[in-house]
Amino acid sequence: GTVFSIKSVTGSYSTSVTTGTDGSATLSAIPAGVYVVREESVPEPYIVTNTEQTVALRPGKTSEVTFVDYEKPGLEIIKKNIANGEPIEGVTYRIEQIDGSFSTSATTDNHGRIFLASIPVGSYKVTEINVPSHVILSPIPQEVALKAGETSTVTFFNAIKPSLEIRKLDSVTGDPV
């Protein structure tokens, strides 16, 4: 569950509580007064909100505070053939947080897709680092900002290397030689 700290503004009372599977926690028989409730830790894949709420507790009354948590963002990378829009499998990307605090690499599947779930919020640079032999490497990285609770998509388009077919035919019969 999520861990919350509860502290009186006078400093006379302090405790922590962990929410149950229903997402709630109840404290009973605490002194009346003004308290600051702060989210301290959350289970994966959520992000600590770093917000506090102040609540006044009065004798004989129940007060409630609600915190809304967002999941860590997701990143989808799509790779397509620029000529026909078909997906390209086997392209490897480096995904780096701009501040250097997170880096990973991943390779497109048979649908030309990579999906990274639950990665840190922040700005990222996505760079193509390896392609199949028939694909031309795209040297221009893309930047994307990932926000809590959202999935962002970046799409890369690549050209396929040209091919050449040579035929040798008999001048009289037209049969292959």
Predicted regions and their residues:
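Solvent-exposed loop/turn and edge beta-strand elements of beta-rich ligand-binding domains
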Residues: G1-V177
